[in-house]
Amino acid sequence: MNTKPVLVILGPTASGKTELAFRIARQTGGEIISADSRQIYRGMDIGTAKPPRWMLDEVKHHFIDKKEIGEPFSAGDFAEQAAEKIRELHQRGITPVVAGGSTLYLEGLLKGFAELPPADPEIRAQLTRELERHGAEALYRRLEALDPEQAKTLDPTKTQRLIRSLEIIEISGTTVTALQSKTPGPPTGINFTVIGLDLPRELLYERINQRTSAMIQAGLEAEARYLFDKFRDEWRSKNLNALATVGYRELFEHFEELHDLDTAVSLIAQHTRNYAKRQLTFFRNRLDVEWVKAPLDEAEIEALVEFFSTRQDDSVPHSPIAIAKKQNA
């Protein structure tokens, strides 16, 4: 059994995961497994910051452009299929590099999913009525009181997960956070080394603002307009969760004349910053991550390349960068 560590690079949006994973995969002859729940959809390119075509051509990426918008693909599907892909790459002697920031994709792959109670139609219907009557903020405040750690990881506007969290609490009599602590563990035969890219908040926010501007300049408005025209009915009926992605939903609201373009762009940057905060909260509270100061310098990148090119045992080092540097000294 191949127990060579599998490198996982995670971090908040705009932290540099794509570029670092590409460099390591290219220099190790590896392939990238994208842990991004939006890049998996075809047609959502600029707004999800997909790697440019030259990167995709130079290094094989998996789980990008795999599905049409609207095709079902759950975090459980990703965890199962990503584990299968890692085993396949190991059998072929290829180094897999997992990179992404989708919290549930990463949790499912790294820890497995806790056993949660099935949906209760009556409780869900009651919560839905409360949502319609009192709004999402009231339900979010309730979740904050009952399970503050879970609330910190949720976008208050994503009502599906909000209702599910409250439903689980109502059914089980305990919190989602407590239930999620009882996970089955990583896939059999796969050993992960997880590093998180830790940027100073000011730098991270600056990068988010710059990327938002770059997306607009690259044609995000036209991309969103095409999707809005194609999925207008689904957007209005809230039947496609993918369409609620930051960067698209603000422009869709602009197309509905709820605000002007400048406001939409400002909201994209603001909502992306909020999303980055929720990602960091989730990673720090729910996953075992070795955080490294980013951006990494050349010596640190080369140390990672060397470490994952040569290491064959099944130990998970506390600091792969530090150990690799020591070995190469």
Swiss-Prot record:
Region of interest (Interaction with substrate tRNA), residue spans: 36-39, 160-164
Catalyses which reaction(s): adenosine(37) in tRNA + dimethylallyl diphosphate = N(6)-dimethylallyladenosine(37) in tRNA + diphosphate
Pfam (any one): IPPT
Annotated residues for binding of substrate: T13, A14, S15, G16, K17, T18
Record EC number: 2.5.1.75
GO molecular function: ATP binding; tRNA dimethylallyltransferase activity
Swiss-Prot/TrEMBL keywords: ATP-binding, Magnesium, Nucleotide-binding, Transferase, tRNA processing
Domain of life, source organism: Bacteria
Requisite cofactors: Mg(2+)
Residues binding ATP, per UniProt: G11, P12, T13, A14, S15, G16, K17, T18
One biological process term in Gene Ontology: tRNA modification
Keyword Nucleotide-binding: yes
Site (Interaction with substrate tRNA): S102, R124
Matches recorded under InterPro entries: Dimethylallyltransferase, IPT, P-loop_NTPase
Assembly mode: Monomer.
Protein family: Belongs to the IPP transferase family.
Functional description taken from the UniProt entry: Catalyzes the transfer of a dimethylallyl group onto the adenine at position 37 in tRNAs that read codons beginning with uridine, leading to the formation of N6-(dimethylallyl)adenosine (i(6)A).
Protein name: tRNA dimethylallyltransferase
Organism per entry: Chlorobaculum tepidum (strain ATCC 49652 / DSM 12025 / NBRC 103806 / TLS) (Chlorobium tepidum)
